[in-house]
C-alpha cells in the first residue's frame, strides 16, 4: 500500500505545501457551504470558483452541470513594472489553516519584496469572499495592484462595469461583471472592491480588455515598509436571487462598510462554532491532521439553512456535474448528523423539497410513492445522463433517503420535524418499495432488474444492498408511524419480513441472485452489517468481510469501501485489520501538495468528500463505537477497538445535546 507523506504532517490544524509544482498540483478548497474557492499554484489567483445550487444544461452528458463562476478575487501584483508569477518568485509556500478556513501563501519576489496572501470564503456571508494581501518592501519600490474579473468560458453577453458610488459619506469603487450561463438560462454576476487600511484610499483606476476587466491602484513603498490591503466581493446567480447583479453590488458595499477586521472576526467566530464539534485523537498526530482535514471539507461543503445537499466532490470543482447521489445520504450524512445535526438537516431539507419530483418519478416508472433519482440537481428530477444504466435502475438511493430521515429522528428526537417533513419522506419511500417488489413462487419478495450498489453488477435481481436498504426503509416507516401514533400500512412489515436474500452454500452472503464471484466495484454485501445492520452474527460478518475484501481490485474503485471494512473489523475486535483498511481508505488516494483525496487510488479528481464521510464513520462508529439505535432511537455505544497505537479518542459536542464521549484504548 502506498502511503504518501505531506509537509506539516504533525500540525493538527495546518497542512503546509512547501514545494509548489504547477505540473503536480491539486488545489485545496476554502468554502462556506455555498461558495467554493479552489487554490491555484499561481499566487493570489483561483483555479475554480463554484457556486452551490447553480446549474445549467450544457456540455457533459447533456444534463444539468455545475458552473464555473467568476474568479472575482484574482489579483495581480507588479513591482517596478514586473508582474509576480510562479516562474519569477522563490520560497512560495501555501498552507491550509483548517481551524480558521483560510488558504495562506508566502513568497519572495527577487530581492525586492516579501508577499503574504490569505483567501477566505466568508462563513457568515454565503456569497462573499475576501483576499488579504501584505507586502513588505525590501527595497524602495513601486507597487501596482490589479483585481481582475474574466468572463468564464462559455458565458455570453458579458457586461463589465466600473462605478464610483457615494454610499452615505463614503465613496465606494465597484467593479462588477454580468453574463448569461451557456444556455442563457441563468444570469451570473460578480462584484469586487478594494479595502484599504486606516481609511486611506489610493486613486483607483479601471481597465478593460476583450472578456475581462480590472481595477487597479499604484503607490510607492520605502524599504522596510509594510503595506496591507484586501479585495472583497460577492458572486451569485439568478438561481439564488431574482436580481443578482444589484445584489452582489449591495453585498460588496456591505463588506466594504463592515471592514476587514470585522469580516474576519465574524468568519472566525462561525468556524469556532463549527469546531466545537471535534474529534481529538491522542497518540497519532498524522491521523489527527487527516481526520481534521476530512471534517473540514464536510463542514466547508455544507451550510445550515441552505436547503442544499452535497455532491461527491462538494464545492471543490465540477466533478459528477455537482449532482447529489446516495453518497450524500449514506456516506456524508451520518457523521454530520452526529457532529452537527443542523448541517445534516439541510441535506434532508433538500430531499423534502424535492419530494413532489420523486413522486412524479415513481409515477413515470409505474410505481407508487416516491422514487428518488439516482442523480439529483436543482429540480429533483432524474439528471443521470441517458447513456448510464444507473439512472433508470439504481433504485437503492430511495431507501437511503428514507433511512436517513429516520436516522435524523433517532438522533434528534424532533417529533415535530418527523410529523411535518420526516414521515412524508419515510412513508412515501416505503410505499414505493411495496409497489416495486415482486412476490415470488418461494413466497419471498424480490426486487428485480436493478443496478447494484456494486455498479459493475447491472440488471441483476435481488441485489443484497438494494433489498437490505429497502427492508430497513420499510421497517423505519412502521416505527415512524408508531412514534407518531398514526396507522401504518400493514404491507410495510409484511414485505420487510419476507424480503429475499441469497447465500452461498458455505453461508457467505451472495451479492445478488446470479452472482458467481466476480470482482466488485465497491462494497455492497458488507453494508448489510453496517449501516443496514441486518446481519449481526459475528461469524457471518467476518465471513462476508473475508470473502468480499478479496473481490475488490487494487485500483479504480471508490474510497469508501475500505472505510466500511475498517469500521466492521473495529466492531469485530480486529484492530490490525481495522487499522490497515483505515489507511487504505484514503492514504493511497492523496494527491500533492496538500494530500487532497481522489475518488480512487491513483485518481486525479479530488476532493472526494464521499470517501471522507466514510472514513469519519470509521472513526466515530467504528473506533469510537457510536451507534444510532434504529429501534429504541437515540445514540448508544457498542463494543469496538481502535488502532493499537492510539491512546484515546474524544468526541466533543455530539448530537443535539452536545455530549462528550471519551473512548480509551483497552
Question: Which role fits each region the language model picked out?
Answer:
Residues 1-10:
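Bacterial Sec-dependent N-terminal signal peptides
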Residues 9-30, 34-320:
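Acidic/polar, glycine-enriched structural segments that form the non-catalytic walls/loops
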Residues 22-54, 331, 379-383, 439, ...:
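C-terminal capping/lid segments that line or modulate ligand- or cofactor-binding pockets
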Residues 111, 123-128, 407, 412-416, ...:
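A conserved hydrophobic secondary-structure block that centers on an alpha-helix together
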Residues 293-300, 350-357, 424-436, 472, ...:
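Alpha-helical scaffold segments in carbohydrate-active enzymes
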Residues 302-316, 342-403, 409, 416-420, ...:
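Helix-terminus loop motifs that line ligand-binding clefts
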Residues 324-354, 403, 410, 420, ...:
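Active-site core of glycosidic bond-cleaving carbohydrate-active enzymes
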Residues 408, 414-423, 442-452, 456, ...:
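Active-site neighborhood of glycoside hydrolase catalytic domains
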